[in-house]
Amino acid sequence: MNMGRTSNLNVKNRDLKRNFFSNLSLNVRVLLLVFLITLIVFYIFFFKPLNYSILYNNLSNDDEKSIVSRLISLKIPFKFNQNHSELLIPSNALKKVYLDLAEQGLPKEKKVGFELLDTEKFGLSQFNEEVNYERALEGELARSIQKLENIKTARVHIVLSKSSVFIREKKIPSASVILEIKPGRYLNYNQINSILHIVAQGVSNLQIENITIVDQFGNLLSSMNDLYNDSYSNNQLKYSNEIETGYKNKIESVLVPLVGVNNIHAQVTAQISFDKQENSEERFTPNYSNEKQSVRSVQNKKNIEFSEKYSDNSFSSNQGVLSNKKLNDLSNSSLLFNHNNIPNFSEQVSSTKNSKRNLSDESVIPQSSTNQNYIVNYELDHVISHNKFNVGNVKRLSVAVVINYVKDKHGKFVSLSTDKLNSIKKLVCESVGFSRKRGDSVSVVNFKFSTPEVYFQSPPSNYNKYISFNNLFEFFLICLGVIILCLLIIKLNFLKILFKNKKRIDISNNYAVKDNLTSQNKGVEDDKELKKKLSSVLESDPKEIAMVIRKWISG
């Protein structure tokens, strides 16, 4: 009886363990659900990752040590980025930390800008004012340069020109920039050129040629010739690639509708001239014909001279020249006109007339001289031409086109006919602007393409991503704590249920024991009554009892 009861108890315990959640009451289930939701909300609001913001970047070693020790004393969490260049703290504590560090005077190596001029004292000398202005200007330029990518720190030194009435030759301003580049980074031409222009535009009368840029290793970065050559070569390569890609796209856009998308491959090589050419030409064309002649100016000059010599025979003492008279008539005219009958040379006409006459009372010898110059100036056929050729002209093109076989009616791949290849070649020539003068070459061939093998690549797994060990350990501890709490709650409820069941079992066992006891008591009472009856029978009829005992013995 006892063995059967213990086996029944074990079966009941197993059923209780298996059907624990089903045996739970509705109130207990609701309480468990509310508890789990509370844990999730608690984790989201109290254990979520903090939003970090940049406190300072590119700190020196001394400032970094001082600031970190101060954050530790304030019990504010902090961390650095992967490059160890930015100090990060929670965003909600940013203002508090700024104020506290400002009270401590941190960081000490902070760049000073134009705010230095706000604290000038009264009675400051001119020299101190100039020095403060230079310091403020250097600090502002250094701040601007440090905003650029790949630059960790920057220092700027400026020598300004001093104007004075006693100095005739004005000093040219100059500047030097020292850059500390981030590890593993470099500056390209555009970034260096931008730094040069920032400094040049920030200082009055400063030329780019007077700016020197040096990195932390002592390398000179401001060599304009090298910068220009590097940039020019990069731009040339980029321009050539764009030209070749444009021609390639033109070829594919023409041939793809004919042969299909994946049935054509084109390659274009362009030789481009980047030489700068300027041509000046001056030509003189002779204009012998009268129709092409154009008169620029005409000069007509006429000079007439008169002289008379009188001689009287009655006056012997007054022989000789009695009178001498000259008349000069100068006529100059400059005319601008076109005339077909005017010769193309200078004409000079000279005429001299002499006349003599004899008088009775005197001897008169009149003389006249005429000098005439006629000059015509013609315009020359003069042509001056200035030709400037564009940079980036295509000198020669080489085009190669490969076309795949096409399918026939039976689905087999066959080559294209010669006529089709020739027509395709003509289309290619027209699309790229083929020119024999340049020596362009176009080649179109027909081959069967090989079918590429398809490799299925699995999508990238998230397990390959970088996971911080600290975050993983914290998450593991949180999950472990939640699991332990859930197990404790489940165990407590299970123990409560078991305790109730044990009470029920004990009560039932007690009732069974009582039943057994009552049955045993009833059996004892029955034995007593039998004994009484036997004793009464023995007394009344001993012979019958002897007969019964003999039968029991005989069997």
From Swiss-Prot:
A biological-process GO annotation: bacterial-type flagellum-dependent cell motility
A GO molecular function held by the record: cytoskeletal motor activity
One Gene Ontology term, aspect cellular component: bacterial-type flagellum basal body, MS ring
Main subcellular location of this protein, as a coarse class: membrane
Membrane topology, as annotated: Multi-pass membrane protein
Domain of life the protein comes from: Bacteria
Subcellular location: Cell membrane; Bacterial flagellum basal body
Segments traversing the membrane: 30-50, 472-492
Keyword list, A-Z: Bacterial flagellum, Cell membrane, Membrane, Transmembrane, Transmembrane helix
A Pfam family assignment: YscJ_FliF
Role: The M ring may be actively involved in energy transduction.
Record NCBIfam families: fliF
Family listed: Belongs to the FliF family.
Assembly and interaction partners: The basal body constitutes a major portion of the flagellar organelle and consists of four rings (L,P,S, and M) mounted on a central rod. The M ring is integral to the inner membrane of the cell and may be connected to the flagellar rod via the S ring. The S (supramembrane ring) lies just distal to the M ring. The L and P rings lie in the outer membrane and the periplasmic space, respectively.
PANTHER family with a match to the protein in the record: FLAGELLAR M-RING PROTEIN
Protein name: Flagellar M-ring protein
Species in which this protein is naturally found: Buchnera aphidicola subsp. Baizongia pistaciae (strain Bp)
Name of the gene this protein is made from: fliF
